[in-house]
């Protein structure tokens, strides 16, 4: 199973940009992990989108999953129990969930270069050895640990 966390800044609201970015990233991943090919609909049975359920990138990720009939796993933050720490606790749970002996974990983070919550998710993903893609929608660049490329 491939667990793909789609997360990011709450002010990110460009679905078309998210979709285009995900297609580009999945094309790169297809060669290495055989999860998808050029046509995203070709093989999605071994993939799940993981969402923190926040507005912005998380919600757009769920919209993407619905459009392509991809299974989802939701991790809403428990603000009533954990207060201001809820988002950080939720991020940790998602990162740990995405990587098991039976799954490959991937993070696609849509970041403005400022959001502390998104930076926290990126740091957790790297700490937990998830394949990490950071889409800086302000500079139109996608970065992973091996390369830097443009969305457009």
Language-model features, listed with the residues they occupy:
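Acidic/glycine-enriched connector segments
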Residues: 3, 12-152
């Amino acid at each position: 199973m491939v667990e793909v966390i789609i997360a990011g800044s709450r002010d990110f609201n460009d679905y078309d940009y998210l979709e285009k970015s995900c297609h580009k990233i999945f094309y790169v991943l297809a060669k290495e992990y055989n999860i998808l090919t050029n046509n995203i609909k070709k093989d999605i049975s071994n993939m799940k989108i993981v969402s923190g359920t926040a507005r912005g990138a998380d919600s757009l990720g769920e919209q993407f999953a619905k459009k392509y009939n991809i299974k989802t796993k939701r991790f809403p933050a428990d603000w009533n129990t954990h207060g201001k720490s809820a988002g950080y606790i939720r991020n940790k749970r998602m990162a740990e969930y995405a990587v098991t002996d039976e799954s490959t974990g991937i993070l696609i983070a849509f970041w403005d270069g400022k959001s502390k919550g998104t930076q926290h998710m990126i740091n957790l993903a790297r700490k937990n050895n998830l394949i990490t893609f950071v889409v800086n929608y302000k500079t139109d660049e996608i970065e992973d640990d091996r390369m830097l490329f443009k969305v457009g």
